[in-house]
Amino acid sequence: MKVKAPGRVNLIGEHTDYNDGFVLPFAIDRYVELEIEESDKFCFYSNNLNEEVKLSSLQKTNSWADYIVGVIKEIEKRGYKIQPVKIKVDSNIPIGAGLSSSAALEVASAYAISEYFGLNLSKIDIVKISREAEANFVGVNCGIMDQFASAFSKKDYAIFLDTMTLDFQFVPLNLKGYEIFVIDSNVKHELSSSEYNLRRQECESALEIIGKDSFRNVTREDLKLLNGGTLLKRVQHILEENERVLKTVKALKENEIERIGEYLYQSHESLRYLYEVSCDETDFIVDFLKEKDGIIGARMVGGGFGGGVIVISKEGSFESIEKLLENEYYSRFGIRPTFYKLNSSDGVTKIK
């Protein structure tokens, strides 16, 4: 039996998903494909790496296989006993570009196991199992957006998700005449995981000082309690980024794509100066694009300290500057960026 789960890109709402905020992701037309069959021991094979991991019992491997092992362990916590299986994995989602290859692997694994063993897990169960696998087993304390987008997405729509309540609505992606790209900076700075966890701690500290249990209850008035400084900058980003998500949803519904470009630039400036998670390479890409005709908007995507930049451009405009950007980026940083044109996609599904 074969299934596939898509990667995702988040149009806007960065570093808000673990702060009870709003996000606006959509699944992309790049997938993790997974084939499952019976076996006498757990066996996980990656076609991309040409690597096989065999386990007689479910334990940590400190490899890509941990995403699958973590999912199986989370399913077993819910009272199911999973017999050994062989799982073959193939993926065309770029790793490290902020397109959620790990969430797609988790969602594909949970869905495949549910279907194969007839567990009838709901999509929301699959999302929660996948997120808990990453937090509890892999050890990355992520939000829930990536897994949610990989499971629930619908082609030609973005998901407006409230990460506090998990209420969501589909918002039409009316992009006629426009294109979406992600530019992979091909850098990943060492700070990424330590600074990500530090940002989470800073947000929790700010809430403690303010005396509220969620950023959704924080008002502008509350900001005075932070007495300026780093924590104020972090909270300002979260509050303003939530507002930008709401404005972007409105603009999408009203077919005002150009307005969205402005919100993307504002989001990047906020991630650069208030949340302080961008880097020279992604800043360079966004600054370069700002000056160019036909580019509507751009911002860094993902956790930061490298990774990708999302771009909305008028049809045909981006290709005309791609080579110039590549050359200028190379002369500045000594590496070449990678460009991906993205289309929206449905969420996890069986492959016929």
Curated annotation (Swiss-Prot):
UniProt catalytic activity: alpha-D-galactose + ATP = alpha-D-galactose 1-phosphate + ADP + H(+)
The keyword ATP-binding belongs to this UniProt entry's keyword annotation: yes
Entry's EC annotation: 2.7.1.6
Catalytic class of the enzyme: transferase
Residue positions of the active site: D146 (proton acceptor)
UniProt keyword Nucleotide-binding present: yes
Coiled-coil intervals, chain numbering: none
Annotated pathway: Carbohydrate metabolism; galactose metabolism
Summary of the function given for this chain in its UniProt record: Catalyzes the transfer of the gamma-phosphate of ATP to D-galactose to form alpha-D-galactose-1-phosphate (Gal-1-P).
Full protein name: Galactokinase
Organism: Thermosipho africanus (strain TCF52B)
